[in-house]
């Protein structure tokens, strides 16, 4: 039974039992920014199990793509050394949300395995939690499982919990017995870690709610969460003891064998490569790109581990990305998103492979030298850190090599080196830092800026030079804290508001507003009179600047959505800056964006602006926001209540910034630049509204000037330029022909200037007006004509000297063109080289050329 047939059989079986088939969620969990990767089928149903989300069905089934690499669940170091560890696997699951419970879950599992798949009952072993008498009775008394193939286990293996508190409950696991010829004992026995009994299905019964004191309270509606590894089940059904021998892996292993030249399909490095292409490809599909932090670094580690295993097999050229088409053939039907993103996956992996290839060989030499000089069995932390810092070797890659040599790595020493580097970085970043905007204040400010541009407020505190004062007078710079404010404080990439605090003839100009804890710091200067603590003032923001910031912030959301639409869902925000004058957006992408793509992105943003969709801003609890589809950034800390900014069907994000009410208020949107700022990170800068109109006016003015210079009308500029380009190419062609004729005639004249030196015809001369191509053509003619010959020809263009040297092949044993041209080039401030019969060089001192050419005869005399 193929893996594809198993997927279908599983889903079909549970759909017949009233379950709704739910497509796999991404390997990047959209509902849990604290979780590195989706590592189980239940992750996409987490809110449903917690009662924070309701679905239109109470029974679900899925085939979930999962990753276990990095974080709590990390199988990376075992991949390639065991039969069943993978960084990527597929989990078959069926779920009950307060519907059926233990009896039905056990019946479904047993029926599917023994009847649908036809597995012999005597090959299956059952475990239950030692205190779960209910599950025990169902298995032994109702299902008729033999007590000889049944065991009770402790909480370590058979009690599941979502965390220290919350839903939890006992598990029942189903194992497959691979036979007495395989080492290992049954679950619960001293030798249970062998390969004879392999867990294939885990049935989790969410039965209790664990409180902080450890008390277990029965849930009013218990649920079921089950998970079965497709790869393990396929190994059973295909009569294999090693997952890498199933159909899903064999096609990839064979392709890796073809690319590396390794013929042994059981080679552990081939298996590592086959496993790693699966996890790497699906990470890119779901928006992860190689980087030096978070998920991106996990991806980088896995890619580089795969490349190192290819290098171990003798493959020094890039190869890893070439496995993607084979993977698509195997898994594209089950995961259409893989087909859609194939080109992006190939490009991202190829770029990372090319980047690492530049340092891999040198890094391996350093490591080999260190290993050769080891007096013990531990690679030092300093060596591991040097490989990491200089050559891009993740620690686990170095540990992988060490493991193959029965060595280990001083990980504690490596961490000491890392911490020392972090300390240096902190010191550098804090150098000269000022804390002038840090004040001793623990109160709070009520923000009313979403609704109001101005409001009366009371001055709660004033700080001058970080010292709390009762009063500030004209000319003094100060920080003012109010009890409430319409001023937006700098956060989320949006700059703080500017404006004024006034009362009668007293005025304080606010240059910026920042947040410290729950307090808003109004930073500025007293411009008239004085201000005092307890004084009631009118706080008024610069409305024009605020509206411009709102336009740019809303445009940033539309830009983010447009980038994901045009470039792919791997695009994720890496940073942003929203000012009244412009916006800047940093995002993950693996290559420069083409002019055509930039135009498409700009048009898509403007299209959504012109739709004039209402911008809905709503506060809701975090789980409701996630359920609505709002994007949550990995690593961001969100409170229980978040603000959701919804722009029609095009964009929905969590955001605390200020925005327009309708997208049409943004006005025109223009991209002004696109650039790369780091590996895998691009930056777009853009303007909106009046600033965008200004760029259009400037371009229009420039076009008018160009048209005037070309003596044509605006509509004809493009065709006129094309005409001029064509004419220029024709003129260049004619010039080249004339230069060739001139050089040829000069060459004919030069033939009479040949001097014979030790039987060799020597010629060294300058050709006026010649380029390098003309020098070569002339050289070829003269070399054939003057056989045996040693010739140097030169040309001068400004302060640059071009040199070519040619030597007849019959004399290259003694007279070599590369050495000859280098002899001349060194005298004119340059260098060069090439083949024994043909070489080229350059120089930057034309004043020495005549003398250098004169030295050729003497040089030939010494070698010929």
Swiss-Prot record:
Keywords for this protein: Aminoacyl-tRNA synthetase, ATP-binding, Cytoplasm, Ligase, Metal-binding, Nucleotide-binding, Protein biosynthesis, RNA-binding, tRNA-binding, Zinc
Annotated GO MF terms: alanine-tRNA ligase activity; aminoacyl-tRNA deacylase activity; ATP binding; tRNA binding; zinc ion binding
A Pfam family it matches: DHHA1
Sequence similarity: Belongs to the class-II aminoacyl-tRNA synthetase family.
CDD domains for the chain: AlaRS_core (cd00673)
Binding site for Zn(2+): 553, 557, 655, 659
NCBIfam families: alaS
Function in brief: Catalyzes the attachment of alanine to tRNA(Ala) in a two-step reaction: alanine is first activated by ATP to form Ala-AMP and then transferred to the acceptor end of tRNA(Ala). Also edits incorrectly charged Ser-tRNA(Ala) and Gly-tRNA(Ala) via its editing domain.
Bound cofactor: record note: Binds 1 zinc ion per subunit.
Location, primary (coarse class): cytoplasm
Species this protein is from: Hydrogenovibrio crunogenus (strain DSM 25203 / XCL-2) (Thiomicrospira crunogena)
EC number(s) reported in the record: 6.1.1.7
Name of the protein in question: Alanine--tRNA ligase
GO term, biological process aspect, one: negative regulation of DNA-templated transcription
Gene: alaS
Places the protein is found: Cytoplasm
Segments for region (Disordered): 828-847
Record comment regarding domains: Consists of three domains; the N-terminal catalytic domain, the editing domain and the C-terminal C-Ala domain. The editing domain removes incorrectly charged amino acids, while the C-Ala domain, along with tRNA(Ala), serves as a bridge to cooperatively bring together the editing and aminoacylation centers thus stimulating deacylation of misacylated tRNAs.
